């Protein structure tokens, strides 16, 4: 009931955009800095506000696509995989800074982009995380390796190969922060992940699980212990 109330009065769907009478669809790009070990390393090297990029094809962000940790928690195995706002690192790191952007594309480009992303998810065993490419990207050195992608390279490849947009530089050199500078993208939200409207809507709509209750209790006890020490 709370979920339906929130969605009706606070989560307003965007009007479908048009350009010169042509119906357009929207691809969403979510930038985050989760504070994981890899995120901290990238942040230490680049100083970028955001260290991870994901993409979605629905405004509720029910499913995000990227090249990242496959099980949602541990760093490896990694490669093209789906992410969820209420699972894995996104669930544990509600205080992570994030920004949500919208890119309006033609119906044809939208279909091609979604099809390409889904294909890579379905054939996930063929793809790997581009660890060396990520390191070289931070040093502004191009490194293309077949079927290997880091997060922003994955998003860039899907957008470029589908004809959704033209990139200002090679996909292997695209940083998550670069998307925040693109004039084609419209910023819909900037703040902490826990306050993202789509994340809030999910939390209102889900029933608490034994694991979530247990994690909540453990976090509460840990915070109480820290207060006693200091």
Short names for language-model regions:
Residues 5, 19-230:
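Cysteine-nucleophile amide-bond enzymes
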Residues 13-18:
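N-terminal polybasic/positive-inside topogenic patches
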């Amino acid at each position: 009931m709370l979920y339906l109330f929130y969605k009706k009065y606070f989560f307003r769907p965007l009007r479908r955009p048009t350009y010169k009478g042509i119906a357009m669809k929207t691809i969403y790009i979510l930038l985050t800095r989760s504070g994981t070990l890899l995120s901290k390393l990238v942040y230490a090297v680049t100083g970028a506000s955001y260290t991870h990029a994901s993409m979605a094809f629905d405004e509720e962000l029910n499913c995000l696509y990227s090249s990242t940790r496959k099980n949602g928690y541990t760093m490896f195995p990694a490669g093209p995989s789906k992410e969820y706002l209420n699972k894995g690192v996104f669930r544990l790191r509600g205080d992570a800074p994030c920004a949500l952007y919208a890119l309006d594309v033609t119906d044809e480009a939208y279909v091609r982009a979604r099809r390409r992303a889904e294909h890579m998810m379905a054939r996930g065993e063929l793809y790997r995380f581009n660890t060396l490419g990520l390191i070289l990207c931070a040093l502004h050195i191009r490194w293309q390796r077949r079927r290997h992608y880091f997060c922003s390279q994955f998003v860039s490849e899907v957008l470029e190969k589908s004809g959704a947009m033209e990139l200002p530089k090679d996909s292997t050199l695209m940083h998550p922060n670069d998307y925040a500078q693109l004039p084609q993208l419209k910023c819909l939200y900037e703040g902490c992940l826990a306050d993202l409207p789509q994340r809030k809507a999910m939390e209102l709509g889900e029933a608490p699980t034994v694991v979530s209750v247990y994690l909540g209790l453990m976090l509460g006890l840990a915070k109480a212990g820290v207060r006693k020490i200091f």
